[in-house]
């Protein structure tokens, strides 16, 4: 009996210990609606978890991967993860993954729709604008949050500028500059991808 107790005690101390890793002190998770049903967004419950591969890189060549401004165009509102989570739960808001399809397919934020930055001005109707004789009427535009790969990625800033040029109201655009890099760094849920 004694050897069993010793072995059990050693096993307990050798097992990994996972602490609660909440989003905030009073928010362990958030549930969002996606086209595939409800998805729970939470953080990876392992304080020892580390990023690897492409997401662990700290430097990229500039140009093309230059640090982006907090505000990509006048009137655009920069947001962080908590504001993005609020928008994901708001039925009137749309969260847009502005990355090219190949990037989107590696995984995305649950509840985001894919509108690549180079298609944004052709798809404003999906964001509450109506097609008219002169292009788009964006009087009824919905609040939109744009994101891409991270603070070194120019895809969502380019989408924001092009949308504004096409008539989308700048004050309806929110920019999550941290993008997938910050999202993954925080261990938040990612859907799709390989």
Regions found by a protein language model. Name each.
Residues 187-194:
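Active-site neighborhoods of enzymes that stabilize oxyanions during catalysis
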Residues 17-94, 101-106:
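Flexible, polar/low-complexity N-terminal or interdomain linker segments that lie immediately upstream
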Residues 128-182:
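Catalytic cysteine-centered active loop of the rhodanese-like fold, especially the PTP/DSP P-loop
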Residues 6-16:
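Bacterial N-terminal signal peptides
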Residues 1-4:
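Positively charged n-region of N-terminal signal peptides that target proteins for export
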Residues 69-75, 120, 134, 146-151:
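Second-shell loop/turn segments in exported
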Residues 77-143:
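Mid-length scaffold segments of soluble, non-membrane domains
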């Amino acid at each position: 009996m004694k050897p069993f107790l010793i072995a059990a005690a050693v096993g307990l101390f050798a097992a990994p210990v996972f602490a609660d890793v909440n989003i905030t002190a009073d928010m362990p998770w958030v549930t969002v609606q996606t086209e595939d049903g409800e998805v729970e967004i939470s953080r990876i419950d392992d304080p020892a978890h580390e990023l690897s591969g492409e997401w662990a890189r700290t430097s990229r060549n500039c140009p093309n991967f230059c640090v982006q401004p907090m505000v990509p165009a006048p009137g655009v509102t920069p947001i962080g993860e908590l504001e993005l989570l609020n928008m994901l739960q708001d039925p009137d808001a749309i969260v847009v993954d502005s990355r090219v399809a190949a990037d989107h397919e590696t995984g995305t934020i649950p509840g985001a729709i894919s509108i690549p930055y180079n298609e944004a001005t052709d798809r404003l109707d999906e964001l509450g604008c109506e097609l008219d004789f002169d292009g788009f009427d964006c009087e009824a535009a919905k609040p939109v949050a744009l994101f891409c790969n991270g603070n070194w990625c120019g895809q969502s800033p380019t989408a924001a500028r092009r949308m504004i040029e096409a008539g989308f109201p700048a004050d309806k655009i929110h920019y999550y500059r941290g993008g997938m890099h910050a999202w993954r760094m925080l261990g938040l849920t990612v859907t799709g991808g390989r």
